[in-house]
Amino acid sequence: FKRGRVESGCELMMYDEKRTGGAGMVEKEEFYLNSTNGVNKLHVILWHPLEEIRAIVQISHGMCEYVDRYDRLATFLAQHGMMVIGNDHLGHGEAAKGEEELGYFPKAKGSETVVDDLYKVTKSIRARYPRIPYFLLGHSMGSFMARRYLMTYGSQLDGAILMGTGSQPPALLSAAKTTANSLSVVRGEHHRSQLMMKMAFGSYNKQYPSVRTEYDWLSRNDANVDTYLEDPYCGFMFTLNGYKVLFDVLSFIQEPAHIGKLPKEVPLLFVAGSDDPV
């Protein structure tokens, strides 16, 4: 790859390799932006079609994964004229400073910081392409962040795709928040709790008659599940701090007053697996 600079002054890494597929060629770039937490660097990837750009799609990835897992989707979209951009959330991928920071959101004001980071990425690319239609795609936990984004910065979007989104009963969410807060006092925010993991995901496999792994609920394709399990940047256990951020965004987006802030003029597409437990 070759190195350059972007307008923010951050280092840019642009791969010389150009991909071809069923349509146009794609150029893949990587660069870093400062997180709004003032501490971490956001790892950002840009899939750039080498033809006229029809639209821009920003990805908000899910829990315990990272944005480059969407490479096949992003490449496909870029081959069909859509620029794709996305960053690793705090506590994920290259935004984490080490293995101990996976599942931990440093200096975060709950989910607000994650959403502000998403908006910072939006501004970085919007400044270069101000007139091109702009869409936000959020998956699973990333869809929760996308929904909070819509409530705060929705006027910046021409549409949004919410994949595998959901909600939690207020009583259950309140109990989970209380448990996470209590455990944090005793064990510290970096603690990785089996109890919290069971509370959050313990029921997800129960609807399936036979299971191979604890993550079978992720996909009906066994190869997809195995790829996830074999990836050191996937499937790690969240810290108590991470669960508090997750519960924070769920609480925020389920508040009736916040739901009323969703921009009515922004179209939404909801997508989910037929047996998705989320």
Language-model features and meaning:
Residues A74-E100:
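Conserved alpha/beta-hydrolase
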Residues Y129-S140:
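Alpha/beta-hydrolase fold nucleophile elbow
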Residues R54-G62:
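Short beta-strand element of the alpha/beta-hydrolase
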Residues A146-Y233:
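Alpha/beta-hydrolase-fold enzymes
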